[in-house]
Amino acid sequence: MSRLLLGLALSGVVSAQTISMQAGGTQLTIKRQPLRIAIEHNGAPVAGAHSDGGLLLGNPDHPEPASVVSESFGDNGRRVLTIGTSSGKSARIALTVTAHQIDFVVQPSEPEAVLMRFAPASPGFGLGDHAVVGRPHFDTDITGYSNDRFLSGQGLSRMISNFVIYPKQKFAFLVWEPNTKIVRSTAQECTQGSRRVESSVRFSVFVGTPKEIYRQFLESRNLFGYPVMKPKYAFFGVGWEAFGALAWDTDQKTVTENVDRYLADGYPLKWMVVGSGFWPNVENRMHETTSFGLYDPKRYPDPAAFIAHFHSKGLKYLQGLRTTFITDGPYSAAGVKNNLFVEEAGHAKVMKFGWPKSPIYFLDWRKPEAVNWFVDLVHRWTSFGVDGYKEDVYGYGKYGLGDDKLDAINEALMREGQYIMGRNAYLASPADLHRVNDFNYDQNQDRGPVNALALAYSGFPLIYPDIVGGTFGEGHFDLKVTPRMKTYMMRNAQWASVHCSMGMGQGPWTFGDPQVEKVMLAAAQLHDRLQPYLYSQAIRFYLEGYPWTMAPLPVAFPDEEGAYGRENDHVRGYEWMIGDALLATPLYGNDYESATARDIYLPSGVWIDYDTGKKYQAPTTLHQFALPPGKTPLFVGGSGIVIEKRGADLVARIFRVNGNGQTTFIYPDGLAKSSIKLNVADWNHLRVTAKNGGIRKGAWKRNAFEFVITPGENYEVH
């Protein structure tokens, strides 16, 4: 009896009708019949109870609401509820309440669907690639979304997250389930669940500010087996992809000529990808990235020298990589013999994906011995000098494979220091970049920005928006150069330049227009200058979970009404914060050919036009603000401190927006830091002192006061 009373005192209060638990400012209230869940934070309601029941069991298409039958405490001291339905379905729920997170681990008495349901909330954001699949309009607000078979492979959906954040209400919600899920965020309900739980399933609700929510989400991802891994610096520079420049049929000569032309024209390339065509060409059984270590002798007669050529120019060299093995390929027999592929009825299952064209076996990612075998095979590529891989498994939708089908492999490669451009993932981030699905000239151009922002909301903010201009060699569209195509190339390059990474493809020189060449080169050079700043934000994401590289305005400014309702194909207000100082405002969308201006929302504070230095007091909307091709789509605000490259140096650029701003910059090694603090009384007479007592020289350039910074040193500007 005394143990029970102590448990009640520490963990909550039981009354005839309710169960209440509290930690910090977070309170969970559960009503018994039917079980209804309500959550408050700091005295304000965040997630409301659904009147028809908050926990449902049984048939996934006709689940039943459950009620609380009894309460107890587990061996770990956690509150445990026994619940049941009117038809006799039952389950146990283990509850954990902390200051910013509530976990519900549900264990049904038999395999069945388990759903958690709250009252409707809006607007909501997230859902990864699913945010742009099967919806009537492109919009980051997922209100109205309902999918009772939420799984990768539905259309272009490969980067998968069912994390949904409601910034106005100050909560986020998900079920941790790599298999088929139920996800609804409608005018009637906020519901998530698993269609079939074999043993147990976890639901998490995060509460607080967006920074608090994303930090808790990060900690849980790392704790529950969905790790966020540390990205690497080179991938945040300007790159080049053979698929964009040369399509599938690559060879040593044309790749070398194309990359060397870009370098000669002043493009600051830091990485490159040859995604296909390097394998032996004669036999179809070799036509896949799993020809490990075997190059076509005519197309790539000296792969080691070929790769070394690019290393000598400072580029990281990557190849395409999939976990699909052509059934009669060079390594498939060993995989079958050792039971390393996905099986059916005790035999390796033969499948047919979108690529390769031949029947394949698929590596069983759930077996550690299969992952180790695959990584050992990858070393056959690494031995030639390959630095990493563009992961691009696709076309598997009809097989119902788990969303996490590539995570273990990519994690193992990342732990070896390989560069990974990720395309498939579930909640985890075992990659340096999160690639938006193939994005081409012939497609609706609102998909790209909505897709990128949706990924950022969902915990995937290391956005690579695919190849600038897309893939001209696939035959998807007429290659005739038109004024529309020229405008597209300029707009696409400028939009890409303010993401974590940008990759060149079709040569700017092929359009026969000096303006196109000038604008595309300027976009690449802008991205190159910002590479250290972008990477610093990526490391902050890795450490804190918050999407510092691409923070949508509803996340960065959740209490400002003007931040909402803009990221859609009607308003086309595609804006986001980069770090604590830059606001990206690219003019993009399906009206790119005719649009020359946008309504730009500036959140609270002082903002400066990056190009002109003109100052604006906000919050305000700049109606029909001119953004012609070539205008840098950036404003500076917040801390007012931006780190850029200047030749071989890194410089802190201080803009006149906040005399008391401060920031911490993380260097390209991902470890060293510098803090910069402003204490400005007179902008016309600035002095920079280092903490070691030294004085740094600075000068006004391009609307900002610049001075060189060095790793490990801290600075004050006054």
Predicted regions and their residues:
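Sec-dependent signal peptide recognition
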Residues: M1-G7
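N-terminal signal peptide c-region/cleavage motif recognized by signal peptidases
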Residues: S11-V14
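Beta-strand-rich N-terminal accessory domains
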Residues: Q17-S51, G88-R92, V97-Q101, Y601
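Catalytic-domain carbohydrate-binding cleft regions of carbohydrate-active enzymes
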Residues: G24, L28, V97-Q624, P628
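Short, well-ordered beta-strand segments enriched in hydrophobic/aromatic residues
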Residues: G25, I37, I102-S109, L582-P586, ...
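Extended, loop-rich substrate-binding clefts of extracytoplasmic carbohydrate-active enzymes
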Residues: P60-F104
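Surface-exposed beta-strand/loop patches in extracellular or lumenal glycoproteins
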Residues: V114-R117, D591-S604, F665-N684, N703, ...
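Accessory, solvent-exposed terminal regions and/or long lumenal/extracellular loops of proteins
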Residues: K631-G694
